[in-house]
């Protein structure tokens, strides 16, 4: 596995120093009133979360729609008091505002380039990720999300994108790839190319 920086432990939660909400394991949510559920959720929010996946969309909007900076700013303001990190999934169509605005709030960023089967869009995504990283808005760079799972690219194509990003952004920014956990076991070249393994686990 490639490690571009020794400080990778910066990206691990120190549970001894982080206030944690007691687990809600065993709670039967079907017996809870709306007010009780809101109270449980409020307890989590007040304690704070390590990170959130950030959605810039509002009712009636979807991926492919271009979102304004003002809308991203409005949504970021809502979550800023409750999280230390945000994850974004794309670097185009308004998603590029997410890490910029997050940094204004002192929030760390895991910034993703959404790769698929459209070469032109892939180029825009990679260019956007590189630009944001070189401008100081990226703490962790994610090159693709479940591309192997969806079979949108070949393994070699993905590896080329990962290599390209690593070659064109500062060495201090770890570069990883996001996929279902088992993809990293059956594709060791991808695992070796990543500074960080970013896995999705579905129960």
Feature names for model-found ranges:
Residues 91, 97-176:
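Substrate-binding cleft of extracellular glycoside hydrolase catalytic domains
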Residues 138-139, 145, 179-203:
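Aromatic- and acid-rich polysaccharide-binding/catalytic face
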Residues 34-39, 93-97, 121-130, 179-192:
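Alpha-helical scaffolding within the catalytic cores
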Residues 49-124:
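N-terminal carbohydrate-binding/catalytic regions of secreted carbohydrate-active enzymes
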Residues 2-78:
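N-terminal carbohydrate-binding accessory modules
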Residues 57-61, 147-148, 203:
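A short, flexible beta-alpha/helix-coil linker loop
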């Amino acid at each position: 596995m490639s490690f571009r920086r020794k400080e990778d432990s910066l990206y691990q939660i120190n549970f001894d120093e982080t206030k944690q909400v007691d687990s809600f394991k065993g709670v039967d949510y079907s017996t809870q009133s709306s007010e009780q559920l809101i109270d449980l959720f409020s307890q989590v929010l007040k304690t704070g979360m390590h990170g959130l996946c950030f959605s810039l969309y509002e009712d009636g909007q979807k991926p492919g729609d271009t979102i304004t900076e003002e809308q991203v700013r409005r949504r970021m303001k809502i979550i800023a008091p409750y999280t230390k990190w945000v994850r974004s999934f794309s670097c185009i169509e308004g998603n590029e505002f997410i890490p910029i605005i997050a940094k204004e709030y002192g929030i760390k960023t895991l910034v993703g380039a959404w790769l698929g089967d459209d070469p032109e869009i892939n180029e825009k995504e990679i260019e956007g990720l590189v630009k944001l990283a070189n401008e100081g808005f990226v703490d962790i760079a994610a090159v693709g999300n479940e591309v192997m799972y969806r079979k949108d690219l070949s393994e070699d194509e993905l590896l080329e994108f990962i290599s390209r990003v690593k070659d064109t952004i500062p060495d201090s920014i770890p570069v990883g790839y996001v996929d279902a956990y088992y993809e990293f076991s059956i594709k060791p070249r991808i695992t070796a190319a990543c500074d960080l393994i970013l896995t999705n686990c579905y129960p």
